Amino acid sequence: MQPLRPDMGAKRDEYRDGAPLMFLLREPTKERILHFIESQKALPFSYGRVGASREDKAPSGYVVDRYRVRLGEGPEAYVRAVQALRGWRQFDLGWVKLLPPDAPIQVGATVGVLARHLGFWSLNTARIVYLIEESGNVERFGFGYGTLPGHAERGEERFSVEWNREEDTVHYDVFAFSRPKPPLAWPGYPFARLLQKRFARDSKRAMVEDVARERLYQT
């Protein structure tokens, strides 16, 4: 499976088998991005045990990441956190874009994650696998999405927010398992891990700031 050449002159045939649009010297146009996402919609997931992240489980041989941050207290903070997740605010990082930005949080929705690096851009695709909507002593909302053939890695990631009624605390929680897609991803895997750690840090900060900002608007 060959990556798209970084010459911005690619032909439609290069999308035929869902080959990753991984490395680009310039930011791709909106039309090109949406065309690539569209080409992935009918393709299968690129890994096994689809949906395993819902139960905090991962297939053997995958790297597991989990991070969590407190967003606030009370039902108002939880409502703001749910709204933030529905709006993909965890991807509002400056160097990362979720496309299309108004993608619905529903099973089957296919999205692209465009990231700007030092001197190049990358685009990866994923599809929502499941939704989480739980009530009780701990209210929880979230979703998991999994990688498609147009992704440099294989795996699944779950984003969720929860309100513990007894403790009256609201948290943002992420669980993911991943591995590089051979043979292209292995040489760049250390760099990919650095990006994953950067995303974890920035994603937590984005959610904290968004929930706090909405609170200020309401006071």
Language-model regions, residue ranges each:
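Hydrophobic ligand-binding cavity/cleft-lining segments
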Residues: 3-5, 11-118
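Residues that form or immediately flank small-molecule/cofactor binding pockets and catalytic motifs
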Residues: 52, 133, 179
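Short, intrinsically disordered, mixed-charge
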Residues: 82-90, 150, 166, 205, ...
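A short hydrophobic beta-strand element
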Residues: 107-108, 139-145, 170-174
